[in-house]
Amino acid sequence: MSECFQDGTATFLILGSICTRNCLYCHVAHGVPAPIDEEEAARLVFAVKSLSLKYVVITSVTRDDLPDGGSRAFARCIGTLSESLPDIKIEVLIPDFQGQVAAIEEVIAAKPAVINHNIEVAPSLYAQLRPQGNYETSLKILSRIGGTPSIISKSGFMIGFGENSADISRLLEDLAAAGCQAVTIGQYLQPTIDHWPVRKYYHPDEFTAIKKTALEMGFRHVEAGPLVRSSYHAALSGSGGA
């Protein structure tokens, strides 16, 4: 956390803290979310100003209860921040909006510097770990983002669930084919005894090898390591550095 603040970077969660999905690797609370806070964008601007931030990541829980999945809230936060603090770089980490094209277009139209949509896990594990998600839907979202030259397309996934090297290669190949420019790869850590068990702890050298492979595939920026998460060194992905 101190490393992020030192770089003037912070991540903000919008749309509440209750997720409408229940993925087996995630410790975010799930259930019935509260109504949208219409003042959230203004409060976000106040927080960013107060912290003197240079790079802001905006993410959310999944809100399948909302007709647009929360895309309007993302667009409003991006627009309000851009208008109030034009020198701030903005990255958003979005859910899948149930694949709604209009919702994805609304976020793209708001013109953040980076749009991240995490693919999360190997496709062979989706049915078990992400039963409410869809691998192909996520790839289509990333392809649409990747087709917008002014926006950096980013994704990420965790390993340690029981995938093999072929699964990891397929993930990287599919992300590259979708036009993804930046990727984060981290070790899955089991949040509680009730969550999916860790099947393998990868050695740092293995992460180094995966990063090398990803860079050779053409990704502009790759973060790979045991403790890497979506927002780690986010400002570097926004600049396109390796």
What are these regions (language model features)?
Residues 17, 66-67, 127, 180, ...:
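Alpha-helical protein-protein interaction elements
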Residues 1-8, 42, 46, 76-87, ...:
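Auxiliary Fe-S-binding modules of radical SAM enzymes
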Residues 11, 27-43, 50-101, 108-142, ...:
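Core AdoMet radical
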Residues 19, 62-65, 97, 162, ...:
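Short, glycine/serine-rich, charged loops/turns that create anion-binding
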Residues 1-35, 55, 230-233, 237-242:
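N-terminal [4Fe-4S]-dependent radical SAM core
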Residues 16-18, 60, 118-121, 187-189, ...:
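Short, small-residue-rich loop/turn micro-motifs
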Residues 22, 66, 125, 193, ...:
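Glycine/Thr-rich phosphate-binding loops of Rossmann-like dinucleotide-binding domains
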Residues 16, 51-53, 202:
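Glycine-centered secondary-structure boundary/capping sites
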